[in-house]
Regions:
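Histidine-acidic metal/acid-base catalytic patches
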Residues: 30, 55-77, 81-162
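Active-site acidic/histidine proton-transfer and metal-coordination neighborhood
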Residues: 1-74
Length: 162
């Protein structure tokens, strides 16, 4: 999976909103066409409103991906961003089932999973319920240090991955 996150740019930095969407769609389709040739997915990551000025929630992503309609582009969700943007993470995952191709996990404080207050039991139960078969990757800060973050992430994955 090739992940497109902040690389997509911001509407506020474009000439106009129309130009932004036109350019984003054109380039995503170009990437996805190439990805299809290589049997790879393009995952469009939803990023919270404090870091990106568009495509923040699962619903934003689903709406845009349905409009775009490319078979090699799917939805990439990240628990850290979902904690900020989604009123109901379980419902958002359920609604995203058809397009969800990649998941990042980090806790509410962006540390390794289990450090903050995220309900990962519910997240992994929901992923099981929607028959999600894609990858789950830890994307967390190396805090308090890389060794601790790494070992705690492995412990977390051993608990939830089966």
């Amino acid at each position: 999976v090739v992940i497109i996150g902040l690389l997509r740019g911001k509407i506020s930095e474009a000439d106009s909103p129309e130009h932004y969407w036109e350019r984003l769609s054109k380039h995503l389709i170009e990437c996805a066409d190439y990805a299809m040739e290589k049997h790879v997915w393009v995952g469009l990551e939803m990023i919270n409103r404090y870091e990106a000025d568009t495509l923040n929630s699962a619903q934003d992503g689903l709406r845009y991906l349905r409009e775009l309609g490319h078979p090699a582009i799917g939805l990439h969700l990240d628990s850290y961003h979902m904690n900020i943007e989604e009123a109901d993470i379980r419902a958002s995952l359920e609604q995203s089932a058809e397009k969800l191709i990649h998941v990042h996990v980090a806790d509410s404080d962006r540390y390794y999973p289990g450090h903050g207050h995220m309900d990962f039991k519910e997240i992994f139960e929901t992923l099981d319920e929607i028959s999600y078969t894609g990858a789950v990757a830890v994307e967390a800060l190396a805090k308090p240090d890389a060794r601790t973050a790494g070992s705690e992430s492995v412990r977390f994955l051993e608990k939830y991955m089966h």
